[in-house]
Amino acid sequence: MIQTGEEDEEKATSLEVEFASGNGVDDEEELRLQWATVERLPTFKRVTTALLARDEVSGKGRVIDVTRLEGAERRLLIEMLVKQIEDDNLRLLRKIRKRIDKVGIELPTVEVRFNNLSVEAECQVIHGKPIPTLWNTIKGLLSEFICSKKETKIGILKGVSGIVRPGRMTLLLGPPGCGKTTLLQALSGKFSDSVKVGGEVCYNGCSLSEFIPEKTSSYISQNDLHIPELSVRETLDFSACCQGIGSRMEIMKEISRMEKLQEIIPDPAVDAYMKATSVEGLKNNLQTDYILKILGLDICADTRVGDATRPGISGGEKRRLTTGELVVGPATTLFMDEISNGLDSSTTFQIVSCLQQLAHIAEATILISLLQPAPETFELFDDVILMGEGKIIYHAPRADICRFFEEFGFKCPERKGVADFLQEIMSKKDQEQYWCHRDKPYSYISVDSFINKFKESNLGLLLKEELSKPFNKSQTRKDGLCYKKYSLGKWEMLKACSRREFLLMKRNSFIYLFKSALLVFNALVTMTVFLQVGATTDSLHGNYLMGSLFTALFRLLADGLPELTLTISRLGVFCKQKDLYFYPAWAYAIPSIILKIPLSVLDSFIWTLLTYYVIGYSPEVKRFFLQFLILSTFNLSCVSMFRAIAAIFRTIIASTITGAISILVLSLFGGFVIPKSSMPAWLGWGFWLSPLSYAEIGLTANEFFSPRWSKVISSKTTAGEQMLDIRGLNFGRHSYWTAFGALVGFVLFFNALYVLALTYQNNPQRSRAIISHEKYSRPIEEDFKPCPKITSRAKTGKIILPFKPLTVTFQNVQYYIETPQGKTRQLLSDITGALKPGVLTSLMGVSGAGKTTLLDVLSGRKTRGIIKGEIKVGGYPKVQETFARVSGYCEQFDIHSPNITVEESLKYSAWLRLPYNIDSKTKNELVKEVLETVELDDIKDSVVGLPGISGLSIEQRKRLTIAVELVANPSIIFMDEPTTGLDARAAAIVMRAVKNVAETGRTVVCTIHQPSIDIFETFDELILMKNGGQLVYYGPPGQNSSKVIEYFESFSGLPKIQKNCNPATWILDITSKSAEEKLGIDFSQSYKDSTLYKQNKMVVEQLSSASLGSEALRFPSQFSQTAWVQLKACLWKQHYSYWRNPSHNITRIVFILLDSTLCGLLFWQKAEDINNQQDLISIFGSMYTLVVFPGMNNCAAVINFIAAERNVFYRERFARMYSSWAYSFSQVLIEVPYSLLQSLLCTIIVYPTIGYHMSVYKMFWSLYSIFCSLLIFNYSGMLMVALTPNIHMAVTLRSSFFSMLNLFAGFVIPKQKIPKWWIWMYYLSPTSWVLEGLLSSQYGDVDKEILVFGEKKRVSAFLEDYFGYKHESLAVVAFVLIAYPIIVATLFAFFMSKLSFQKK
């Protein structure tokens, strides 16, 4: 709580002369003399110069330049100012305010008014279930051309009005879906293009169009979006640098000038702090150190943020980082959305206390929405805005809110948090329990009734009167509002973004090294395949040289693919920071362009250096460098193209298919697959739009106009010119520089497109809401009918399935990890306790105490580190394989398959995890009961969706996570923060359900951060931990928490708990690190010395002994269901995941249609007229195009899909839901019908357009070959995901894989010419078998004579001599083509079962 009065003012003087020793006159004189040296400096120098504490060597205070503070100096200064956050932060702010007031300077303030504010969103009305299936999407696309879609509007905010005042803290409360987030976004000026906004929002009487609201205020989102490679400090430093200092420097100059005039000597430490935080553009800012301290992030300041696949900070720390990222800036108007998610109540209280101090002392304007504020936290607020159904019910002082509802007959119970009461009073199901007039009948009071009553009340009338008066602009400083978009100058913004980009490249250096290593491997293979093919200058070897040049270009084209996924992975953070005006798009784009140039140049140089002389190109050194120049420029254009595609399309699916289409178009029109002279005249323009064409022109001109190709063949035509004529690439000797200029133009064009897309392209929005016609047509009145009392067995837990009660005991558990510096860090220290059947245990502690770590160790989820100690289940050592069968784990982060419904998620869990002898009817009844218990039955048909994009809200996902585990009927349930992200009412519902589960005799343990009094006293036992993973208390809380209160109040010096204080908040507060230091108590050691510890140890030892007649936990099989049932269940889920993922499948269908159509047009009827070898090679090129490019696209699409589902797979595999083989083969089988559809479409389009021979036999061979090819590419993509830790590595591996398949397909260089030491790679390459099947089946039996390199030959003989294809070998080809998918699919299943890249 905030301290006031003289006592605090006396404490406030303790730091004033800390740089001097003693309190005598000499010290005062020394201070004056040292300050005089600062005062003599020019104004600019004076505001960046301060006095720091005396150093130990000279014994004197030091004059320092605050722009050059080292890390140690910054930490020393912050430690001196804010040693204990609870007291020192208030003291610091008061000193700053006192200094400002002393010279008579007024701080800028902002008042935010909103009047009749309305927000509406468009919603699509459909018939049937509102589920986006493949068929629904196709129907929707067709209906757009036939008739308009039926749409309606949903009101999110409905004419709300109010005032958020400076100097006051306002709390925003309301149930989920009431419009809190929308209100916060609207007030901060974040209007989405997809919504319609009415009414007005004003800051200090100015409308949002008159200034820059995004810079004046800060909206802190409930989504934690950060760059995982950066550390916490680096994230805050970058944010502080980009947000600038606002008006701090002007205020500092004014203060300095006035103090000099009035001869005032400020507190040196405060002066140093104010000056250091007023300097713009610093790489490392003192404000960062201050925010790290205030938010408790100093302990993880140098830890990388991390993500789902990379270790990093905890969820609570990420939430605080999101807050700190914006609070570190100069804005004092803060709109904060659910900032306490994942935080313990003590940490939340501390943070909100600091914000309250900022509001009261610095006159900041702060509006915060919280889900479950503890009573102590609730008391910190001055005003409350209570919302319901998109309307404001109450907007007035906090102190009057209980009295307002008492007028309606509703009273908050004595041991009930007011915030919890306010959230539940809106609920039709919970309102009656607060009715206090037992002598009068209760009837449901609607939201509108509350609103009307408030408007008629004195509070409502007062608010209306204030809103009717115009704001007096003359009362505030103009610099309270921001009129500049960007805080930094252009050069400073570019420097900041460049520093960050360079750092990220260093952090991702392994990806770049891996990419270069694969390039070296491809180059080594290529140069040995084409070994000295250029030694002979004839048409045949010239053709091989063309193939080697195409191979180089194709490899460097694919080399740009990883840039696409890397760019997309950063777009989320970029969009957030661009919207906040951290920097313009060009400042972000230029460093990412320029710093990648050396990588492209290096890769191209490596390729040229390794291959040029070994393959046998023209030996002149000049031509070596000219080839390198073209290759590096081409590679740059490709990287730039993929970067631009990512910036334009923004999503991984849309960008991937566009990238694949780009590769297809570039290759088809590039002049190698089909010569320009063979293209239809009306499509010839495509050749000039492809960078690959210019690269081909430049490379071939460089080679075939060289002296060794200058031998005249006939009619003054040289050998080189003849080769170029055959390929349609003869554009003269000077075409090299034309091609080079064109490639430079492409580089500039694509990079300009990238910058423009980042600048003007709208950010990805949440998917449009879909509502069923039935729900839309339902009368509105039905929503306001009071709910009947629920008497179903769902609320009483009547369905009890058989299970074995189990006790988990753990003694002296320790856990160690190795830090990046190679040191060992202990996270758990000698934890002893027991989890008992029928007992609901809470695991509590401040953020970072090790709660989740202990839960992970006990449940067996840790994949790294060293675990010591003894863990037993039922008196026997824990065996993870069997333990996983009887335990459930609710993760902190809600990981679910996005394309199945809520009810299907539960059915899937019950199907695979309940014993096989439980019939389907019972399972379905249990699913229904659990849905009702956690109140998900109303949305059971809703698709889960992707977090932040579509589907369920955060709190609905949390309830789904719990429901999925409850329906599995485990004996032991571990729950990691089951109430995080839920409002007070939803948390109460969930914990009521959990309590019911525990009362059936199951063992349940939950980590919990912000329990209300009701929830805290629901638990039967408490395990309390402190920082360092040490045990502080283990035992029952007692009636009304009496036992835990009695234990801690027995320590002398501890403050007694106040009346109506939440015991959970109190014990977390008194056992914090700062409280221990203040009291001089080590609660961990005190617990070990206590009688309670000895009693607990005896109990644990008794429970650790197996009872007579018992036996260790074992099952007849590893999984609950048979392998066949597992496969069926997984296939059922995969079916819905694919069917309801139209973007995944429509893009693949669209690509095959486009590829087939382009091939049909470019090779129109060419299969009927074969007269020479080039005609046949061109037809072979069409087959190559139909095999390689759709396969590449399918491979890319499946990589995205499998990578997205892998975290779900890890969760389900840990729960022993199924064998990895069952999951893998279900994934394999579901691809079959979709690949068959693609093959049919391709065959139907291509066969008649290209003019292949119309026979059932040959058509079947084409269909069969393409079908097997697609399966091979699909399963290869799955295998790449199984082999790599993240999608970036998988895409990099894909690029190398494509290059190898392209090289050994038999098209670029035929089988007969491949050196014997590489021929095994030809037979290993699936594309070679597919192409052999296609070409041999079509022409292997054709005896027509054609002209081959000047002589006549039968087609079948040419195929055998040139390509090595025999019609008689088709039986072998057929066998290999079906064997390949089976082998690759088996490898995928094997590696999915053996490899895990999840780090815990």
Curated annotation (Swiss-Prot):
Identify the InterPro entries for this entry: AAA+_ATPase, ABC2_TM, ABC_transporter-like_ATP-bd, ABCG_dom, ABCG_PDR_2, P-loop_NTPase, PDR_assoc
A cellular-component GO term for this protein: plasma membrane
Instruction: Give the keywords, sorted.
Output: Abscisic acid signaling pathway, ATP-binding, Cell membrane, Glycoprotein, Membrane, Nucleotide-binding, Repeat, Transmembrane, Transmembrane helix, Transport
The cross-references to SUPFAM superfamilies, in alphabetical order and at most eight, read: P-loop containing nucleoside triphosphate hydrolases
Annotated ABC transmembrane type-2 domain residues: 492-704, 1125-1339
GO molecular function per UniProt: ABC-type transporter activity; ATP binding; ATP hydrolysis activity; ATPase-coupled transmembrane transporter activity; efflux transmembrane transporter activity
- Stated induction or repression of this protein's expression: Repressed by cold/dark treatment.
Identify the tissues in which this protein is expressed.
Confined to roots. In seeds, mainly expressed in the embryo and, to a lesser extent, in the endosperm.
**Which superkingdom?**
Eukaryota
- Membrane topology note: Multi-pass membrane protein
Q: What is its main location?
A: membrane
Result of knocking out the encoding gene: Early seeds germination on imbibition without stratification, and reduced abscisic acid (ABA)-mediated inhibition of stratified seeds germination. Altered root exudation of phytochemicals, with increased phenolics (e.g. benzoic acid, salicylic acid, syringic acid, tartaric acid, lactic acid, alpha-linolenic acid, cyanidin, sinapoyl malate, valine and indole 3-acetic acid) and decreased sugars levels (e.g.
| Residues that carry a glycan | 116, 472, 899, 1040
Transmembrane domains' residue ranges: 510-530, 553-573, 582-602, 628-648, 652-672, 679-699, 738-758, 1144-1164, 1179-1199, 1228-1248, 1263-1283, 1289-1309, 1317-1337, 1372-1392
Record: residues binding ATP 2: 845-852
Per the UniProt record, one Pfam family is: ABC_tran
A GO biological process of this protein is: intercellular transport
User: Which reaction does this chain catalyze?
Assistant: abscisate(out) + ATP + H2O = abscisate(in) + ADP + phosphate + H(+)
Binding-site positions, ATP 1: 174-181
Cellular localisation: Cell membrane
The ABC transporter domain extends over 141-414, 808-1053
Family, as annotated? Belongs to the ABC transporter superfamily. ABCG family. PDR (TC 3.A.1.205) subfamily.
This chain's function reads:
Together with ABCG40, import into the embryo the abscisic acid (ABA) delivered from the endosperm via ABCG25 and ABCG31-mediated export to suppress radicle extension and subsequent embryonic growth. Involved in root secretion of phytochemicals (phenolics and sugars) which regulate soil microbiota, influencing both fungal and bacterial communities. May be a general defense protein.
Report what the protein is called. ABC transporter G family member 30
